[in-house]
Amino acid sequence: MLTVENKADIIKKYQKKEGDTGSTEVQIALLSARISDLQSHFDLNKKDHHSRRGLLKMVSRRRRLLEYFKRTNFEGYRQLIADLGLRR
């Protein structure tokens, strides 16, 4: 589960300016953290199909955001995927 402190740390790390919570980088980083938390949840709960659907929705949303970010800011995109450890 993503705690308030973890979420604040992620936002602080990827924000462009003070109070920035909705930029593409922040959204992608938060989704990546939630996705990794859910993946560890599925190691213990293999039959939790309702949460799996939510995971798939988050993955597709992150994929769309990454495609948009790649189109608009390619250098930032390359740095972000390297920083988050995503394979693309």
From Swiss-Prot:
Transmembrane segments: none annotated. Disulfide bonds: none annotated. SUPFAM superfamilies: S15/NS1 RNA-binding domain. Gene3D superfamilies: 6.10.250.3130, S15/NS1, RNA-binding. One of its GO terms (biological process) is translation. GO terms for molecular function: rRNA binding; structural constituent of ribosome. Pfam families: Ribosomal_S15 (PF00312). Keywords: Ribonucleoprotein, Ribosomal protein, RNA-binding, rRNA-binding. GO terms for cellular component: cytosolic small ribosomal subunit. InterPro entries: Ribosomal_uS15 (IPR000589), Ribosomal_uS15_bac-type (IPR005290), uS15_NS1_RNA-bd_sf (IPR009068). It comes from the Bacteria. NCBIfam families: S15_bact (TIGR00952). One of the primary rRNA binding proteins, it binds directly to 16S rRNA where it helps nucleate assembly of the platform of the 30S subunit by binding and bridging several RNA helices of the 16S rRNA. Forms an intersubunit bridge (bridge B4) with the 23S rRNA of the 50S subunit in the ribosome. Belongs to the universal ribosomal protein uS15 family. Part of the 30S ribosomal subunit. Forms a bridge to the 50S subunit in the 70S ribosome, contacting the 23S rRNA. This is Small ribosomal subunit protein uS15.
